[in-house]
Amino acid sequence: MLSATLRLLSLCPPESRFAVTLTRMQAWPSPPIRSLPGHGKPLRIFDTATSSVRELAPAVTARLYVCGITPYDATHLGHAFTYLTYDLAQRVLRDAGHHVHYVQNVTDVDDPLLERATRDGLDWRALADREIDLFREDMTALRMLAPDAYVGVVEAIPMIVDMVVELVDRGAAYQVDDDLYFSIATAPAFGEISHLSRAEMLAICAERGGDPRRTGKKDPLDPLLWRAHRPGEPSWPSPFGPGRPGWHIECSAIARHYLGGVIDIQGGGTDLSFPHHECSAAHAEVAAGIRPFARSYVHTAMVSLDGHKMSKSRGNLEFVSRLRRAGVDPAALRLALLDHRHTEDWEWTPGLLDDAVDRMNRWRAAVALPTGPDAMGLLAAVRERLADDLDAPGAVAAVDAWVGAALADAGGSAGAGPDPTHQGGPVRGSGGDVPAWGEAPALVRRLVDTLLGVDLEPVRPRGS
């Protein structure tokens, strides 16, 4: 009966099923990408599903989907480190000659958001808007490449419902009371991303938004597709009654709508490999009848503070906005993040920022010199390191070596040479309009900007 009803209602045009006004979410302004001589190398990156470093072999256009924030608190350094991973992946792919179609979602309706809004006496939409605005500011300051589509779950409700309808028609969904669940028995590849045992899955599922103990489910691991309306909660009309989507189906539907077919990377933090990426891939594969959902599943390691993973629930957070308000140069903060492999957990300490500021000062001093060692070797080295599983620390070390040689040749003086902000005419043979006062330092400034996203322009005092 349920399936027949959904088939009938799914024939109705979306505008008749959803009498709501949806506003398209806007991303932040993307920093410019400047050209470099030659082309970069193909990206080899660690794929969680195969537990190996594999060459990403996209078509002309690479398709990336990265899970975004739940906007109930400010951006912390764990978030920043995660999004840096996919910023670097985009830069490497673009440098290798690919176009990149990058989609990121925002979970702008979810239990943690609703709970925080209730606790603070705020409208949940106002809280989400405030934190999304702050996230945009942080991403802009850190010079993260913006997604081509920045999509809120609320605006994606129609496409999410359409995918739920497909899953019902394929016999992959069932009711528990008024809620809809997905049957993992219909997804033969379930578990092949995270490679966890069933006991591990059950334990993690309970910790990360699942409800394995709910009675009436066919399998304790079956994830929620559609949560029927509860008093005091937001809801939207659908063929199966008012409610709101489950967490995992949101990304499945948004990724398919904006990227289609098989995508090249599904990305996020390591804490998303299960259940989120496992379930969202299962939804997409069963709905479309196509496997795999993604060619590579890429996960960024965790950042700790005081011995524990940074998390909103624990409250051990270092916020990007707080550091910016304290006067920290965002370029130095980005450089501190770049000094860590995306596959390795690490701990944040204030000393890391001090080291990054010192490094930034040396880099800026070196590119301000009138001349320096040949930079083409450095360009090749940075490309080599980043193409090898986004080895940002290796790329940073290569720049350090060039900077050390440049400063040594100049006698270690940071004041040598003309004003680095003066731009002369272009010099031929360097791949673009590099300043005439020094081809090598100018190329280094350009490659550090383009490949690492670090702006080596000197910081000017406010009001100057």
Curated annotation (Swiss-Prot):
Q: Where is the motif named 'ERGGDP' region mapped on this chain? A: 207-212
Q: Which GO terms describe its biological process?
A: cysteinyl-tRNA aminoacylation; mycothiol biosynthetic process
Cellular component per GO? cytosol
Sites where the protein binds L-cysteinyl-5'-AMP: 67-70, 82, 105-107, 247, 269-271, 303
Matches recorded under Gene3D superfamilies: Anticodon-binding domain of a subclass of class I aminoacyl-tRNA synthetases, HUPs
Record field: catalytic activity: 1D-myo-inositol 2-amino-2-deoxy-alpha-D-glucopyranoside + L-cysteine + ATP = 1D-myo-inositol 2-(L-cysteinylamino)-2-deoxy-alpha-D-glucopyranoside + AMP + diphosphate + H(+)
- Motif 'HIGH' region in this chain: 69-79
Motif 'KMSKS' region in this chain = 309-313
EC number(s) of the enzyme?
A: 6.3.1.13
Q: Does the keyword Iron apply?
A: no
Binding of Zn(2+) occurs at 67, 251, 276
The protein's required cofactors: Zn(2+)
Q: Where does the record place the region Disordered? A: 410-435
Q: Which family does it belong to?
A: Belongs to the class-I aminoacyl-tRNA synthetase family. MshC subfamily.
NCBIfam families recorded: mycothiol_MshC
Among PANTHER family, the record links this protein to:
CYSTEINE--TRNA LIGASE, CYTOPLASMIC (PTHR10890:SF3), CYSTEINYL-TRNA SYNTHETASE (PTHR10890)
Instruction: Identify this protein by name.
Output: L-cysteine:1D-myo-inositol 2-amino-2-deoxy-alpha-D-glucopyranoside ligase
What organism is the protein native to?
Answer: Frankia casuarinae (strain DSM 45818 / CECT 9043 / HFP020203 / CcI3)
